[in-house]
Amino acid sequence: MLFMVIERFKDRDPIPVYRRVRDPGITFPEGLKYLGSWIEPNFDRCFQLMECDDARLLQQWVLANARDTGMTFEIVPVVTSAETREVVAPFLDENPLAGGRCSTS
């Protein structure tokens, strides 16, 4: 599964977090894969895309790496737009006024 991890920097101060990344390094439990991250220009939030099959790995990661940084975390399960298109496709031809699928007969 994919998870969007939204990290909030305490007082918009990224220095403790980046110091943590540089000095002892960030560790990831086996099975948790970091895919990428994006930082807001004002240093308010960091958005990290992570992948794992067990959400407990995210809990382990937070506890092992972030307790002394002042960050808060929101972890949101997400689905790619390509996978969502597959789910939505069968419903695209429904007639909302008829309350079901369009009939061609």
Please place each PLM-identified region on the residue numbering.
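Short S/T/G/P-rich N-terminal loop/turn motif that feeds into the first structured element of a domain
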Residues: 1-35, 39-45, 53-57, 78-105
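Conserved short hydrophobic interaction patches
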Residues: 24, 64-68
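Short, electropositive alpha-helical surface patch
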Residues: 57-64
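Conserved short beta-strand edge segments in small beta-sheet-based binding/regulatory domains
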Residues: 68-80
